[in-house]
């Protein structure tokens, strides 16, 4: 009987897992071409929520913090992307700019936020979300207010859908890798007991800040 190393077993399992994933991706690309625009918009919305849910799970699930301000970073990235598109920037560059702006915002906000715990942390993140919404309304000359921004309809809908699919696949892959990584174990340890995690040498403050940055980007 052949003996396989752990690495070979993991690679074999990964190869087997890629078969249904490739089939699912092919189906997601074919469905909009068969059922038209309604199916494309519906699947685009689902992919968007999958991306949001998995990015939220880094702080809300792996770290175990009740985190009510995730929409702030999502909105910041979305508005940055929309403003870049409105100024005739390429779609890929606009998406990159959105992520690049969310990263320093999360890094800065993580410093005061993670001095708080429990319900106080949850209320603080909710307050930031409400503050972001109020700023959006007050700066309507720039953000479009409650109506949002109107973008030039010069992008191929299937290209936008394909990018959303690629983004969601990247987020799923990164989340899966994170769960099995050292950082993922540190997040789980911090969730169970910050005191115990600190006692074995885990820098809980740094781990929590990294979690928020991962989640925001």
Label the model's feature ranges:
Residues 1-217:
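Transmembrane alpha-helices and adjacent helix-loop boundaries
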């Amino acid at each position: 009987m052949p003996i396989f190393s752990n690495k070979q077993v993991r690679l074999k399992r990964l190869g087997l897992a890629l078969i249904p994933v490739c089939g699912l991706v092919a189906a997601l690309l074919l469905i909009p071409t068969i059922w038209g625009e309604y199916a494309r918009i519906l699947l685009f919305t689902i992919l968007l929520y999958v991306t949001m849910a998995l990015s939220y799970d880094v702080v809300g699930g792996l770290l175990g913090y009740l985190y009510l301000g995730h929409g702030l970073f999502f909105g910041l990235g979305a508005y940055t992307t929309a403003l870049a598109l409105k100024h005739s920037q390429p779609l890929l560059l606009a998406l990159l700019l959105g992520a690049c702006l969310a990263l320093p915002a999360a890094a800065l906000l993580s410093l005061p936020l993670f001095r708080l715990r429990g319900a106080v942390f949850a209320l603080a993140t909710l307050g930031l979300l409400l503050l972001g919404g109020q700023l959006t309304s007050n700066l309507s000359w720039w953000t479009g207010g409650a109506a949002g921004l109107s973008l030039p309809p010069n992008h191929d809908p299937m290209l936008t859908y394909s990018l959303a699919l690629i983004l969601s696949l990247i987020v799923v892959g990164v989340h899966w890798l994170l769960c099995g990584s050292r950082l993922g174990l540190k997040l789980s340890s911090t969730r169970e007991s910050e005191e115990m995690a600190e006692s074995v040498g885990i820098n809980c403050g740094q781990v929590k800040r990294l979690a928020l940055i991962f989640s925001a980007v």
